Design a protein with these regions (language model features):
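Positively charged n-region of N-terminal signal peptides that target proteins for export
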Residues: 1-4
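Short S/T/G/P-rich N-terminal loop/turn motif that feeds into the first structured element of a domain
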Residues: 18-225, 230-255
Length: 255
């Protein structure tokens, strides 16, 4: 079955508490629009690269993030790309480096944006609550928070507790949520002052609204989940964005 919400569904059927987390790879480019260009130009050029990627058989998916509540920023948008593993990452980069120059010349009007900062992460999908495809939004909300492990705690311990908490949320009627952890990989100018970034993705704004309205009461009735997380990890600096998939050339998967 073709992945609909690319990287948030790719591992969902295989992850369990007992398993070691399977790492995908992500990259983030922080970009500003060039003079006379709009986000429609950005979307069009991304989709054109998606066609190139598809023709060359590389396994890569790309999305655009627009700041929603992200504080003062020095960029207009973020391009977020993901591969299923490290092998696919370097195969796609090799295709881009060696073959895309000629294809890029066919893009009329020049580049839509200038990207001045780029980072790569190890991307671990931890847990998700499904939602019917018909109920999902084309553009959906995501949040990122910087997190530090408490002394002696491992990421696997945090993920195991996260899975328990998300299962409890699902049993309580929440839906349309995926949670992933991004561990710094490359491109960070200084040693990060955090261990990982927690990434919440909602499949629709209605799902996010339901969580905003009901999570407080749920947490009050089930305090043990958050208390357990507080013993493992500390998170701060939450920012929110609008997420929109541009293309998805990840391989077919079951689940």
């Amino acid at each position: 079955m073709r992945l609909i919400v690319a990287f948030f569904m790719a591992l969902a059927s295989s992850l369990t508490v007992a398993q070691e987390m399977t790492e995908m790879r992500s990259e983030f480019f922080y970009c500003t629009l060039n003079d006379g260009k709009t986000m429609e130009d950005v979307r069009e050029q991304s989709k054109q690269y998606g066609e190139f990627s598809k023709e060359n058989g590389t396994h890569y998916t790309q999305a655009i993030l627009l700041p929603m509540h992200a504080g003062e920023t020095d960029y207009d948008y973020i391009t977020w790309g993901t591969w299923p593993d490290g092998k696919a990452m370097y195969e796609e980069w090799g295709s881009f480096a060696n073959n895309y120059e000629a294809a890029a010349e066919e893009v009329t009007g020049g580049a839509a944006g200038t990207c001045r900062n780029s980072i790569a992460t190890f991307f671990n999908l931890v847990a998700r609550i499904p939602m019917d495809a018909a109920k999902r939004d084309k553009k959906s909300p995501v949040q990122f928070s910087r997190c530090s492990l408490n002394e002696g705690v491992t990421l696997e311990q945090v993920a195991a507790q996260e899975m328990e908490n998300v299962k409890q949320m699902e049993d309580a009627g929440f839906e349309g949520l995926a949670i992933a952890y991004h561990v710094p990989y490359m491109g960070f100018n200084e040693t990060p002052d955090f261990d990982f970034v927690m990434n919440y993705y909602w499949y629709s704004f209605d799902a996010r609204a339901h969580a905003a309205q009901n999570y407080g009461a749920f947490a009050a009735e089930n305090p043990e989940g958050q208390e357990a997380m507080d013993e493992l990890v500390s998170c701060e600096g939450t920012s929110s964005f609008v997420f929109e998939t541009m293309f998805n050339n990840l391989p077919d998967t079951e689940g």
